[in-house]
Amino acid sequence: MHILVVSVNYRTAPVEFREKLTFQAAELERAMTTLQNQKSVLENVIVSTCNRTEIYAVVDQLHTGRYYIKKFLADWFQLEIEEVAPYLTIFEQDGAIDHLFRVTCGLDSMVVGETQILGQIKDSFLEAQQVKATGTIFNELFKQVITLAKRAHSETTIGESAMSVSYAAVELGKKIFGELTDCHVLILGAGKMGELALQNLYGSGARKVTVMNRTLSKAEIMAEKYMGHAKPLSELQCALLEADILISSTGASDYVITKEMMTKVEKMRSGRPLFMVDIAVPRDIDPAIDELEGSFLYDIDDLQGVVEANRAERLKEAEKIQFMIEEEIVLFKTWLSTLGVVPLISALRDKALAIQSETMESLERKIPNLSDRERKVISKHTKSIINQLLKDPILVAKEIAAEEGADEKLALFAKIFDLEMEDVESRAEEVEHKRAWTPSVPSL
């Protein structure tokens, strides 16, 4: 089995392509179920955010797994593989494990050290578990990754100086307008990104705030927290007439603000400029609007320069976290290496217990007058002898499993104890069929 990551992210793909490969939250479970039925895929978790769409998979063959995951992405988004392939980054084995740790800890984020990705990874993992897309390997790996990410943020100061993308959008607005006290601010979208933006705006002095959302009640709840006003999306054109700053993050599949709409609005704004930041992926605002004279449009990729603030300090903390990651990878690989020896140990235990059972039957025939208590005492002590005898061989088998040339050494181990390899292989298949189990996931 092999661990594989297929990634489309902000480093390798511009926002105009990333938005083509973004899974909507409502379709994520169906997507993971579909991917789970692809050839070679044994386990999978799909993570889709504004800056990345990534498929984490356990596959039985690397080459086959790579191909069918690429094909799945192309088919799902109705593209050709040739269109998708140039923007994909693929990580395998140790590189894949390291990438998952780095992403979850915020080291691969546009804003190094941000914590929002940790919650997004956990949510995707839980959804994958619900549709039985994960099994023994990913249940252990993701549990370990989430635990480390929490520890990394509590034991270092990387998160203290990290900006969110929403914060960066507000900082960009402050650079252009200076004080925000007299600015009319319009927030489109009442999700996490929108609320983070509003929180940062309020902290920067903005008080003339309007929140709009497809569900008006959500906009009202969010606006009330920050002394703002809520309006239905049907009044968007009027709201655009009043706004000085617009920050949009609705999660809509089509443009919420089109060039045609904005052309009409500009004619009624009497030359007043409108600063627009689109932090949604797919984008909410038609990029052609940037061609208009009075509209200044920035998308999520334009925020890269803003988030460079405090980067040196955060990178110093990132080095500490990378060291923690490397230690965890060693622990995970040690655990992973012992998976192959489980059927062998199981076969050894069963053979020893079968001998113990036969011995008990022989003893009862020779001493038929044993009481129930005597039988239980003898059975308990003979099993104890077996456990003590097997303790060292089992430890040795686990050590061998982590060494080079483990297959040959374990085959010799099986031969010494006269274990049938067919029986061991059969047990391995049984273990594989029982991959899906649900461990507790660390709370955030």
Curated annotation (Swiss-Prot):
Disulfide bonds: none annotated. The keyword NADP applies. The keyword Kinase does not apply. Keywords: NADP, Oxidoreductase, Porphyrin biosynthesis. One of its GO terms (biological process) is protoporphyrinogen IX biosynthetic process. It catalyses: (S)-4-amino-5-oxopentanoate + tRNA(Glu) + NADP(+) = L-glutamyl-tRNA(Glu) + NADPH + H(+). Its EC number is 1.2.1.70. The record marks H99 as: Important for activity. NADP(+) binds at G189, A190, G191, K192, M193, G194. One of its GO terms (molecular function) is NADP binding. Coiled coil: none annotated. The active site is at C50 (nucleophile). It is an enzyme of class 1 (oxidoreductase). Gene3D superfamilies: Glutamyl-tRNA reductase, N-terminal domain, NAD(P)-binding Rossmann-like Domain. Pfam families: GlutR_dimer (PF00745), GlutR_N (PF05201), Shikimate_DH (PF01488). HAMAP family: Glu_tRNA_reductase (MF_00087). PANTHER family: GLUTAMYL-TRNA REDUCTASE 1, CHLOROPLASTIC (PTHR43120:SF1). Homodimer. Possesses an unusual extended V-shaped dimeric structure with each monomer consisting of three distinct domains arranged along a curved 'spinal' alpha-helix. The N-terminal catalytic domain specifically recognizes the glutamate moiety of the substrate. The second domain is the NADPH-binding domain, and the third C-terminal domain is responsible for dimerization. Catalyzes the NADPH-dependent reduction of glutamyl-tRNA(Glu) to glutamate 1-semialdehyde (GSA). Belongs to the glutamyl-tRNA reductase family. This is Glutamyl-tRNA reductase. It comes from Bacillus cereus (strain ZK / E33L). The lineage of its organism: Bacteria, Bacillati, Bacillota, Bacilli, Bacillales.
